[in-house]
Amino acid sequence: MRDVRVAIDHNATNNQLLFDKDTDTLTVDEIIRSKIIDAARIVEMSAPTRLLESSYNLEDSVFWEGQGRGYVVLPDDFMRLIAFRMSDWERTVFTTIEAGSVEYAKQSSRYKGIRGNPQKPVCAVINRPIGKVLEFYACKNEDAEVTQASYRPYPQIDPNDGIDISEQCYMATIYLTASLVLHTFGEKDLAITLSELAKSFYQI
């Protein structure tokens, strides 16, 4: 809460009285609290993978579907893949493709060379009746095992009013939270300024 207030105060001009005597401190803190989750989600979904921490691991139980294809079930709090690799792959996958994309359609091709393979693997986050799964394409055979599988969860405030944010995304989240709060108070110009400042921390 304090860091968001500091960000607003440091960027306000002398003529801007953002939190006057009629603005209850508790009300302001509640607004900050309500915006910080959205800000953290936006920042960590937009930031390059190299800025994100990978302290959350996926289950390594694999469900095979033939032709070296398979999937792992994703947890309910899954927001974004950080890294995934099978034991016979030559590279790690850091980004996923979408279900409606041309690349995803290629994974159903009858021609093996068009689909993902150990030299150029592909992963997709897909909704199934059992929930979200991470489909992977493909392995040489079903003897392969998961060797790396990490993700970022949807941010949430814990019972101690803490929130887990990747260290290198912290300042961007603070400034974007401040921007969202300022929009609530009708300070659109300063809100835009702080939003752009937030982007400067992760669009590098």
PLM region spans:
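Glycine-enriched, solvent-exposed interface loops adjoining structured elements
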Residues: 1-204
